Amino acid sequence: MSDSDSSGGWGDVERHLRMYVIRHEKRPVDDPTFDVSLTAEGLQDAEEAVLDELNELGVNAVYSSPYRRVLQTVQPYLEQDHVGMGACVEWCLSEHPEPNDTPPTEIPDEFYEEFHIEETYTPFMTAEKAHRLNGDIEQVQSRLCDFVELLSRTHDDGDVVLLATHQTSVHALLSMASGIPIDCMDVPMGKVVELDWHGVLKYKYHGGPNPPWACYESHFIPNKRKGGGDLKWTYIEAGG
């Protein structure tokens, strides 16, 4: 069924809950710590390509890692008058592996002045618990599964939810949903990808898909154009 009716509007067509993930825009390659800012190019792309795509998708809920660079990525979208909301800062979307000598435990006061943040939002996971569940990729997958399940229960049909986070979390979510190994993925910075959240829940309760192919890094071919583009995968059959 088409998402829209023949008149170009949504009509009476039912719109299901959709979730998207975005990896933050470009940062300095040698500094993944909490307070590092996007590069000049990353800031510009956040104000142009990312902004345009989020407007096109009609995102109406944003959950963000507390890291400065992630909030910078979604800020141009959130500061628009028609959006009318802030980012829900969520510690379970934090960076992995831990890049800070001392893991952060609270949002700096200046972030509330610099970014549109929902001050009344209570995070699904405290900073302390997120840090405890940051030792390996299995812990990251577990905390992300639990969060996606919560979102699937608290959001309504028609909602368009964005999870703004980091490379490892983006790859972990897409891997759980698709069965494609994390090592085969290289989602570009600033890229928005739709998440099959049903697939994530199936992974949590029944284990992930078991695709009948061998996969190498070269199989994952991102295509990031100014207007977004598609993510494309190529596969080699097992034994081929």
Question: Predicted segments — roles?
Answer:
Residues W10-M85, G190:
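Active-site-proximal alpha-helix that buttresses catalytic centers in soluble enzyme cores
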Residues D45-V50, V70-T73, D136, V140-L151:
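Alpha-helical packing segments of well-folded alpha/beta enzyme cores
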Residues P76, Q80, L150, T154, ...:
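Active-site catalytic microenvironments for nucleophilic, acid-base chemistry
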Residues V36-S37, E79-C145, D186, K204-H206, ...:
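Phosphate-handling substructures
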Residues P28, R69-L71, E95-P97, S169-H171:
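Short, active-site-adjacent cap segments at secondary-structure transitions
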Residues S2-R18, V83, E95-E113, D157-D159, ...:
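Acidic, low-complexity terminal tails and accessory targeting/binding regions
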